[in-house]
Amino acid sequence: MGRKVTVATCALNQWALDFEGNLQRILKSIEIAKNRGARYRLGPELEICGYGCWDHYYESDTLLHSFQVLAALVESPVTQDIICDVGMPVMHRNVRYNCRVIFLNRKILLIRPKMALANEGNYRELRWFTPWSRSRHTEEYFLPRMIQDLTKQETVPFGDAVLVTWDTCIGSEICEELWTPHSPHIDMGLDGVEIITNASGSHQVLRKANTRVDLVTMVTSKNGGIYLLANQKGCDGDRLYYDGCAMIAMNGSVFAQGSQFSLDDVEVLTATLDLEDVRSYRAEISSRNLAASRASPYPRVKVDFALSCHEDLLAPISEPIEWKYHSPEEEISLGPACWLWDFLRRSQQAGFLLPLSGGVDSAATACLIYSMCCQVCEAVRSGNEEVLADVRTIVNQISYTPQDPRDLCGRILTTCYMASKNSSQETCTRARELAQQIGSHHISLNIDPAVKAVMGIFSLVTGKSPLFAAHGGSSRENLALQNVQARIRMVLAYLFAQLSLWSRGVHGGLLVLGSANVDESLLGYLTKYDCSSADINPIGGISKTDLRAFVQFCIQRFQLPALQSILLAPATAELEPLADGQVSQTDEEDMGMTYAELSVYGKLRKVAKMGPYSMFCKLLGMWRHICTPRQVADKVKRFFSKYSMNRHKMTTLTPAYHAENYSPEDNRFDLRPFLYNTSWPWQFRCIENQVLQLERAEPQSLDGVD
C-alpha cells in the first residue's frame, strides 16, 4: 500500500489583471511540480486574476476572464494527472466569493469559498467579497457553459468540504483563516484530514516573517498533519510587496522553505512525506483523539486518484530543515529592491531619477537601487532568462548582458544633486562620492537662478521681498523661502526625468524616486509637492532608525565607504542660510523631537491605537526614568499638534513601499480626517489635569472648554 506522497506548493509573481502572464506562470508552476513527481499542486490566493485587483473585482470582466483562464488550464495537457488547486473570484447566486477551484483531469472536484475575510490594515476583502458562512455545507454550483463544454459537468460542489483520495484526505483553508481564533484546520484535522492547504496573499512587514512560520508549525505540532502554504510574491500593482515564503510542514517541523525575496517569477517547492508519520504522530496525542472522537464530519468529495504509488518503499523522503530568517537590514536591502524591479520592468520606463542630497534618506534609496542591480546581475548569472529579457528591454539593447552592478546602475539610475546658496560643500561632496561608488550617472546643478526668477515674479507683483529669519524675516517669510526651493527641486526632478536620457541620445523616460521616510511623513516634516512628491518612494514605509542601520549595513555589504561620512553628518534640509559656511539647520531641531521619539509616537498612535491622552498615560510609565510628567505632556502635545496640522499632506503622499505597521499612508492603510482642531482642547485638558494631579495640584474643570 502506498503511503509516501509528493506535494507541491509555490510562490508566483502574479500581476493584477495580467491574465495572459498569470496563466503562463501558473502553467509553468504546474509543469515544474509534475516534473518533480508531485501529485498535488497548490497556488497562491486569487492567482488567476492577481490578488490586487481591488475594485476591479466588481467588474463582470474580471469574473469572465478568470473563467476563461480556468478553461485554458483545465484543457491544457500540462494539468493532466495532477490535482490542481487554483484561486479566482466566483459568483454564486449573485454573490461574489474568493474561491479555490480544485480540478483533476478535466473535471472540477470542488469550489471552496473563503470563510474568513481579511479586512484590517491594507486588506479590504469585505468590500468585494462575502464570506461563506455555512460550515460543513455544500451546494450545487452551475458551471458556465464554457467550462461545461470542457468538463461535461453541469454542476459541481460549492462550499465547505474536503477531498478524499484513495490514500488520504485533503482540506483547504485560505490565508486569513489560518489567523482566526477558530481556524478550519482545527476541525478538519480532528475529522481525519491529513493534508491541509493554505493559499495566501500575504505582504511583507519588517520583522514579521516568523509569524506565519510559527503559526504553521504550531498548527501541525498540536494536531499533526501536513501543511502546505502558497503565497504571492512581488509587486502586483501597488504599494505592497508579497514576500513569498511558501512552505511545507509536517508534525511541527518545516520540510521546505521558499525564498522571501527573489526575482524569480515562479518558485515551486516540493516535498515527499510519509502519511504514516502523520498517523503515528496523532496516535499518541490522547487529548487530540478524544476531541476527534466527537468531531462533526465534513462533506467528502470522493476523488478517483492517489497521491502515492504502490511501489514507493524505496522512495527517499524529505528531511526537516531549520527556517532561515533575514535580519531587518537584509529585509530592507532585498524587499524594496525587488519591489522597485517589478515596478520598473512593468512600467516600461528606462530607469530611475533620484534627487541625491547627500543625506541618509536619499543615500538609502540609492543603496536600494544598487541592491536591485546586484540582484539582477546575480539572477542573470543564475540563468534567469526572464530577468535578462527584462533588462535588455529596459536599457533598449538586445545584446546587453549585465555582469557588473555598477555598470547596470550607470545605465538605469540618474542621480541629481540640486544645490542652492544654502547648500554646503560637504553634502555636494558626499552625494558625488556615493554616486561614483554605485556607478550612477550623476548630475550637479544649481537652482538659485530658478529661485531668483520665481521670487522676482512675486516681488514684481506685490512689491515685497521676503527675508529668511536669519536676515530678520518672520517665520512665515522664512518658511515660504524654504518651500520655494523645495518645490523648484521637484519641478526640475520631473524635467530631468523626462528629458535627461533624450539629451544623451538614449531612448525612454525615468521614474522619479522620493526619499521621505515614514517618521517624517507621520509628522508632516516635508514640503507638499517638493522632492517627497515623486512617482514612487521605496523608503516611505521605513523609519529613520532602521534606515540608518541599513546604511551602516550597506557599507560592508556593498563596499560603499562614502556612506560613512553620510552617517556621521547631522540630518539637515539645507533650506536656510549657512552660518559661516556651516549648516545652521538640523531636522531634529526643526521638528522639536528626535527620530527615536517619532518612532515611538508612530507605533503608539497606529499599532496601539492611542489618542493623545492614552499616549500620555503610556509614556508616563515608559519614560518615567528620563522625563517628568510635565515633559511627557509637552512632548505628546507637540507631536499631536504638528501631526494634525500636517495631516493634509498625507492625502498627496507619494505611493510608498509598505514596510511598517505604523505607516500614515492615507490611501487605505491609515484612514483619518485631514482637517483637525489642532489645539485638541478636550484631550489636552485631560492631560493637563493628570499632570496637575501628579504635581499635587487641583485639577481644572472640563466645563466650558472652548
Curated annotation (Swiss-Prot):
Pfam families registered for this protein in UniProt: CN_hydrolase (PF00795), NAD_synthase (PF02540)
Outcome (variant: residue 175 to S): Eliminates glutamine-dependent NAD synthetase activity with the ammonia-dependent activity intact
Pathway: Cofactor biosynthesis; NAD(+) biosynthesis; NAD(+) from deamido-NAD(+) (L-Gln route): step 1/1
Alphabetical UniProt keywords: ATP-binding, Disease variant, Ligase, NAD, Nucleotide-binding
Keyword check for Metal-binding: no
Associated disease: Vertebral, cardiac, renal, and limb defects syndrome 3: An autosomal recessive, lethal disorder characterized by severe cardiac and renal anomalies, including hypoplastic or absent left ventricle, transposition of the great arteries, absent pulmonary trunk, and hypoplastic or absent kidneys. Patients also exhibit vertebral segmentation defects and shortening of the proximal long bones or micromelia. Death occurs in early infancy.
Residues engaged in binding ATP: 355-362
Role noted for this protein: Catalyzes the final step of the nicotinamide adenine dinucleotide (NAD) de novo synthesis pathway, the ATP-dependent amidation of deamido-NAD using L-glutamine as a nitrogen source.
A GO CC term assigned to this protein in UniProt: cytoplasm
Gene Ontology terms for molecular function: ATP binding; glutaminase activity; NAD+ synthase (glutamine-hydrolyzing) activity
The gene coding this protein: NADSYN1
Record: active site: 45, 114, 175, 357
Protein name from the UniProt record: Glutamine-dependent NAD(+) synthetase
Reaction(s) this enzyme catalyzes, per UniProt: deamido-NAD(+) + L-glutamine + ATP + H2O = L-glutamate + AMP + diphosphate + NAD(+) + H(+)
Quaternary structure annotation from Swiss-Prot or TrEMBL: Homohexamer.
Keyword ATP-binding: yes
Broad class of enzyme this protein falls into: ligase
NCBIfam families for this protein: nadE
BP terms from Gene Ontology: 'de novo' NAD biosynthetic process from L-tryptophan; NAD biosynthetic process
Region (Ligase): 325-706
Enzyme Commission number(s) of this protein: 6.3.5.1
